[in-house]
């Protein structure tokens, strides 16, 4: 007991010296903007809709002079036409939150990386992998939800082929100072079908070697 009592007294003294009026910790400005929360099958009131199922008006083909040859479907989805080229948004982006839904073909062909392979590239540089990873083993840093080659997903939350799957992704772009020197890496938080699979992971290098210091577009891959 003679060792415990002095320790308690010291702790009490330190606490009393650090005591702060709770009101001094209150921050009133800036006040967060009010938005309408999303309802089931809804979207936040300030969201930018990149695809409404009717046209590709906010997208371009990577083959700059070519029209987009992907299919528009009756259920207001789009389908990649292999070999026609990737598409990207007309608008460039910095740090964003993205909700995207996707599914892989019901008819299974191939295995590993040859099953519904695609990717979502943020700023055309950093890839979140899209793949049929349901009972389909491949290298862990290349399965669905991987930050391609760099970060393995925490778990495999994949659904069977033909089922709609969801990614909710928070992308924080890397930061540069006025001299163009990187001062902070970019990062990803990824939820796959509501399950956290990437928890603030740091991006050490781009999937595609492009200038990281400038904004760029969102890119959907045609893997062929």
Regions found by a protein language model. Give the residues of each.
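Bacterial Sec-dependent N-terminal signal peptides
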Residues: 1-17
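Carbohydrate-interacting regions of secretory-pathway proteins
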Residues: 17-224
């Amino acid at each position: 007991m003679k060792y415990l009592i002095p320790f308690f007294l010291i702790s009490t003294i330190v606490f009393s010296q650090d005591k702060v009026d709770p009101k001094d910790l209150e921050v009133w400005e800036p006040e967060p903007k009010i938005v309408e929360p999303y309802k089931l099958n809804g979207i936040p009131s300030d969201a930018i809709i990149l695809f409404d199922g009717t046209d590709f008006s906010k997208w371009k083909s990577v083959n700059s002079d070519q029209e987009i040859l992907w299919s528009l479907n009756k259920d207001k989805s789009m389908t990649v036409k292999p070999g026609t080229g990737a598409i990207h948004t007309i608008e460039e982006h910095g740090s964003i939150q993205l909700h995207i839904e996707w599914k892989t073909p019901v008819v299974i062909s191939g295995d590993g990386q040859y099953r519904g392979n695609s990717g979502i590239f943020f700023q055309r540089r950093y890839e979140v992998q899209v793949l049929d990873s349901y009972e389909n083993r491949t290298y862990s840093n290349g399965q669905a939800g991987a930050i391609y080659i760099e970060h393995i997903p925490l778990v495999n939350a994949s659904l069977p082929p033909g089922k709609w799957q969801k990614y909710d992704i928070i992308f924080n772009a890397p930061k540069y100072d006025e001299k163009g020197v990187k001062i902070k890496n970019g990062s990803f938080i990824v939820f796959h079908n509501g399950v956290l699979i990437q928890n603030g992971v740091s991006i050490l290098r781009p999937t595609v070697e492009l200038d990281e210091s400038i904004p760029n577009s969102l890119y959907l891959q045609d893997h062929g």
